[in-house]
Amino acid sequence: MSARILDGKAMADTILAVIHDKVAEREVQGKRRPGLAVILVGGDPASAVYVRNKKRACERAGVNSVSHDLPETTTQPELLALIDTLNSDAAIDGILVQLPLPVHIDAETVIERIRPDKDVDGFHPYNIGRLAVKMPTLRPSTPRGIMTLLRATNEELRGKNAVMVGASNIVGRPMSLELLLAGCTITVCHSATRDLESFVRSAEVLVVGVGRPRMIPGDWVREGAIVIDVGINRLADGKLVGDVDFDTAVERAGWITPVPGGVGPMTVATLLENTLEAALMHNP
């Protein structure tokens, strides 16, 4: 068999168009556009690309974006002071701090400084906690985007065996909560997991997000499984690949996301969905 492709780019385009129309409706009603502040500290090339993609998406969705490109030498108190200013700015509905941050800045402290109702990445402990107790508000953007992809399969998720490979705060942990909320029986695999292969083979829904190119061989994938590859890794020859060996997995899976063009565009689109939701909270 050959898997059906979950085209994240096409879905993201649809989401951005819907947001654009909703923003236009709000403007007709005399309401302001949603505002997103994007903070980049330092000159990491990959981070700069991600920020540029988010700005382009804002333009397409009709969301006002304000950029704060700070030098590598920015101190933690300086960054926190900027966040305080943005927290108090009524025109800003969402605050995004591009990760990773320079080593002298503590990311957890920075994330916790963002007002939870402006935390459109969904990283704040308050928002993670609400997700954990089945009362989500602003959901973590990558897991929320993945859930949109999963729903697009029209398969019943309730009761399925789901395996999350990776336990990061950004993807693995909140993704496991989303799958639990959807009624899956969820297993989280991490660096201390023994016999990873056996867990992967059992997965009817497999989500992988570890940042290691092709670490999951395609022949581990269960026949007919839904495979979501969060990883994006650049090889020495410049090729971008995921954490799953796509070329072999595509022959066994029922559904699979490509890399690039799968989870990445959905993360950006979901970020703007969250920004619109925040705007609706601030200016109904």
UniProtKB/Swiss-Prot annotation:
Keyword Amino-acid biosynthesis: yes
BP terms from Gene Ontology: L-histidine biosynthetic process; methionine biosynthetic process; purine nucleotide biosynthetic process; tetrahydrofolate interconversion
Domain of life: Bacteria
InterPro entries membership: Aminoacid_DH-like_N_sf, NAD(P)-bd_dom_sf, THF_DH/CycHdrlase, THF_DH/CycHdrlase_cat_dom, THF_DH/CycHdrlase_CS, THF_DH/CycHdrlase_NAD-bd_dom
Record's catalysed reaction(s): (6R)-5,10-methylene-5,6,7,8-tetrahydrofolate + NADP(+) = (6R)-5,10-methenyltetrahydrofolate + NADPH; (6R)-5,10-methenyltetrahydrofolate + H2O = (6R)-10-formyltetrahydrofolate + H(+)
Pathway assigned to this chain's UniProt record: One-carbon metabolism; tetrahydrofolate interconversion
Entry annotated with the keyword Iron-sulfur: no
Binding-site positions, NADP(+): G166, A167, S168, S191, I232
Pfam families named among the record's database cross-references: THF_DHG_CYH, THF_DHG_CYH_C
GO MF term set: methenyltetrahydrofolate cyclohydrolase activity; methylenetetrahydrofolate dehydrogenase (NADP+) activity
Keywords: Amino-acid biosynthesis, Histidine biosynthesis, Hydrolase, Methionine biosynthesis, Multifunctional enzyme, NADP, One-carbon metabolism, Oxidoreductase, Purine biosynthesis
Annotated SUPFAM superfamilies: Aminoacid dehydrogenase-like, N-terminal domain, NAD(P)-binding Rossmann-fold domains
The enzyme's E.C. designation: 1.5.1.5, 3.5.4.9
Any one of the GO CC terms: cytosol
Quaternary structure note: Homodimer.
Cited function: Catalyzes the oxidation of 5,10-methylenetetrahydrofolate to 5,10-methenyltetrahydrofolate and then the hydrolysis of 5,10-methenyltetrahydrofolate to 10-formyltetrahydrofolate.
Family per similarity comment: Belongs to the tetrahydrofolate dehydrogenase/cyclohydrolase family.
Protein's name according to its UniProt entry: Bifunctional protein FolD
Source organism (scientific name): Thiobacillus denitrificans (strain ATCC 25259 / T1)
Gene that this sequence comes from: folD
